[in-house]
Design a protein with these regions (language model features):
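Juxtamembrane helix-boundary/capping and inter-helix hinge elements in multi-pass membrane proteins
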Residues: 73-79, 104-110, 117-122, 251-261
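Selective recognition of specific alpha-helical transmembrane segments in multi-pass small-molecule
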Residues: 7-19, 131, 135-139, 189-206, ...
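Membrane-interface "cap" regions at the ends of multi-pass membrane proteins
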Residues: 10-67, 256-259
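Membrane-embedded alpha-helical segments of transport systems
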Residues: 59-66, 83-95, 129-140, 266-278
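Hydrophobic, membrane-embedded alpha-helices of multi-pass small-molecule transporters
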Residues: 48-65, 202-208, 217-281
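Hydrophobic alpha-helical segments and their helix-loop junctions in multi-pass secondary transporters
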Residues: 139, 143, 147-161, 173, ...
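Helix-loop-helix module between adjacent transmembrane segments
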Residues: 11, 15, 91-107, 111-175, ...
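Extracellular loop-to-transmembrane helix junctions
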Residues: 1-19, 73-103, 112
């Protein structure tokens, strides 16, 4: 379990040191009004406490990704720990910080609009199409995945759960951000964290064996090579471009620029820890 605990510690230290470095490089000015204050409209631009925003952002970017991906990526052995840790610190955390930072600095606009601002109208149109197609695919997974899980836990048909979840998504989309998302998402986000803590506790106190990171070649015959398969199997939990579509939603609710690091970089680190726990659990059972 040494590798597992070391990975978690490195992630936390990475947030404290490298996250602070990233913040200093991009520059934070707390004297400036954020879009949540300057453009407050009671719908999308609603000031909220940063801790609540953190839980919402965490749930927005985490979901099923760091669970399913980490479980599948565990097949590559403890090398998955390295990718999750260094991917989160140097790639995913920076990506999420920057996507939230740029949106906040540009009146809370979406990822496609940001592309238009910096790369031109043609690039914006490409990004709009690209985002819509991929978000539809992600949305399908985020509907059918939970529906399938709920079907196994209840006697209610999967199709019924699909309708219920889809209706909930529509409500969360059309209502002001503080009415559904601001009230329910923090609860779900906290539940996701507690679930991971419970799994970690089970691994520790039940004495499950988690493989250690060594110089051993786990796949000497070339099967399941980590290049490139590990890096596309574990995306959420290391780095995911999907997060750029979610960060602007919360950039419109941040009250002070000093909250950018804990909300965006911090939620990515939290997702990395979730991925580590699920990867460790999968390795213990594999």
């Amino acid at each position: 379990m040494i590798s597992f605990f070391a990975a978690i510690i490195v992630l936390i230290v990475g947030y404290l040191i490298y996250g602070k470095f990233v913040e200093r490089v991009f520059g934070i000015d707390d004297s400036l009004k954020t879009p949540a204050i300057e453009m407050q409209d009671g719908v999308d631009y609603v000031p909220m406490n940063w801790k609540k925003i953190f839980l919402i952002q965490f749930l927005n970017i985490a979901g099923l990704g760091p669970i399913f991906g980490a479980i599948q990526g565990a097949l590559f052995g403890p090398a998955a720990f390295l990718w999750i840790v260094f991917g989160t610190i140097f790639a995913g955390g920076v990506h999420d910080f920057l996507s939230g930072y740029l949106s906040l600095k540009n009146k809370g606009v979406s990822a496609s609009e940001l592309v238009g601002i910096y790369l031109g109208e043609g690039a914006r149109k490409v990004m709009v199409v690209f985002s819509v197609v991929l978000l539809v695919l992600v949305g399908v997974v985020f509907v059918t995945g939970p529906a399938g899980l709920l079907n196994t836990l209840t006697s209610i048909n999967t199709q019924v759960w699909v309708v219920v979840i889809f209706a909930y998504y529509i409500l969360a989309t059309v209502l002001p951000v503080d009415k559904v998302i601001g009230k329910i998402y923090p609860i779900f986000g906290a539940a996701l964290i507690l679930m991971a803590i419970g799994i970690a506790g089970g691994l520790i106190f039940k004495g499950y064996h988690i493989p250690e990171l060594t110089l051993q070649n786990y796949y000497p015959d070339g099967a399941k090579s980590i290049f490139p398969y590990l890096f596309i199997t574990i995306a959420c939990g290391a780095i995911s471009g999907f997060h750029a579509t979610q960060s602007p939603l919360m950039a419109r609710c941040v009250e002070h620029e000093r909250e950018i690091r804990p909300v965006f970089y911090g939620s990515m680190v939290a997702e990395g820890i979730i991925a580590l726990i699920w990867a460790a659990a999968a390795m213990a059972f594999y």
